[in-house]
Design a protein with these regions (language model features):
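N-terminal Sec-pathway targeting helices
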Residues: 1-17
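Beta-propeller blade signature
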Residues: 134-141, 187-199, 249-250, 350-355
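Short, surface-exposed recognition loops and adjoining beta-strand edges that mediate ligand/DNA contacts
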Residues: 151, 158, 204-224
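Repeat-solenoid scaffold signature
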Residues: 214-242
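C-terminal soluble interaction/assembly domains
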Residues: 311-321
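Repeated scaffold domains used in trafficking and secretory/extracellular systems
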Residues: 324-326
Length: 355
């Protein structure tokens, strides 16, 4: 933590120092609480919702293949499943390398190679007994998974786990600090970071530090990432007790955790563009669609739709389908939404939402 030193000169100095300390703590605490958060966001116009599939077990992520079907991961079972556009489910593979799953560990992210029709690669993020890692496989092959990035910290909680290819063709990976807070500020550690690697898992050209996969840091448990139509990256971060965050991410940016949660106003940290109370949000998967950012919320049991500057928030589906894990655009222009832990382990849904 940063240390502040104060020179005290007699009684007057003591009074001045006391006043300064009072002002500092007032600003640091009361001013922090006064920072704007997304509260009482209005309900958006009702959306058309269709139940596309049921009987899933804690799904975490979903990615579309070129043929219009999608792959969905189940965190606890380790199953990678394929869903057709009309909702038919087929088991593709069980990722049996995962550690015994916990409430926040297991099979998590999935991404499709941007050159899939040429190379056929599918990428998955999962926790093992020793680490979290990204591996790749081919749909029609029973060959062992090919690890491309290993050594990401893992724990019972705070494992991040979302993976997406960016507009630049590089693979972006969200990692949590695995319940070890100092990791997030250690630039040599892979926990509490956004990582950026080539499709082969090597540090991507142009990263802030040559030879390092670290793109930005200071995150607690980031589970959502998306790009707008100008190529700007946004990341959602799951807060502790105070505030969740929506961040506009730049290479080399430090987003504050554990020094700051929410808006701190410190020059060495990048403040979020929007914050929520965890009871209202607890953000997970997110996307950019129709000019706005969409975020699926776990504790908040809703979708948030918000402008890219953090303004004009609206909420949808509030309390209707339980905890929401992911929202992602489908080829037909709709949004597909994953529920998470809906009244039982095998009761989760895939919803098709047309705003």
């Amino acid at each position: 933590m940063r240390r502040r030193q104060t020179l005290v000169l007699g009684a007057t100095g003591l009074l001045v120092t006391a006043a300064a300390i009072g002002i500092y703590f007032y600003g640091a605490f009361f001013g922090w609480w006064a920072r704007p958060t997304v509260r009482n966001a209005p309900e958006a116009e009702p959306a058309a919702v269709e139940q596309l599939a049921s009987g899933l077990r804690y799904p975490f992520d979903l990615a579309f293949l070129p043929d219009g079907s999608a792959l969905v991961t189940e965190r606890e079972s380790g199953r990678l499943r394929q869903i057709s556009p009309d909702g038919g489910l087929t088991d593709v593979r069980i990722i049996d390398e995962i550690a015994e799953p916990t409430v926040q560990a297991g099979l998590q992210g999935v991404a499709i190679s941007p050159t899939y029709e040429r190379d056929g690669w599918i990428y998955v993020y999962y926790t093992t007994e020793h680490d979290s890692r990204v591996s790749r496989l081919r749909l029609e092959s029973s060959a062992p998974l090919e690890p491309i990035l290993t050594g990401i910290p893992s724990g019972k909680i705070h494992n991040g786990g979302r993976i997406r290819f960016g507009p630049d063709g590089m693979l972006y990976i969200t990692t949590g600090e695995a319940d070890d807070r100092p990791r997030a500020q250690d630039q040599k550690d892979l926990g509490g970071k956004i990582l950026r690697v080539t499709p082969a898992g090597k540090p991507a050209p142009g990263n802030p530090t040559a030879g390092s996969p670290v793109y930005s840091w200071g995150f607690r448990d980031p589970q959502g990432l998306a790009w707008d139509d100008k190529g700007q990256l946004y990341v959602s971060d799951f807060g502790h007790h105070n505030l969740d965050e929506l961040n506009r991410v730049t290479p080399g940016g430090n987003y504050g955790w554990p020094e700051v949660e929410g808006t701190g106003g410190e020059p060495e940290f990048t403040d979020p563009i929007a914050t929520w109370k965890p009871a209202d949000a607890s953000p997970s998967g997110m996307t950019y669609h129709d000019g706005r950012i969409w975020i699926a919320c776990l504790r908040g049991e809703r979708l948030y739709r918000i402008a890219t500057d953090g303004s004009s928030p609206q909420q949808l589906l509030t309390g209707q389908y339980g905890r929401l894990r992911l929202v992602t655009p489908a080829p037909d222009g709709s949004l597909w939404v994953l529920t998470n832990g809906r009244s039982g382990p095998d009761h989760d849904l895939i919803l098709r939402v047309t705003p």
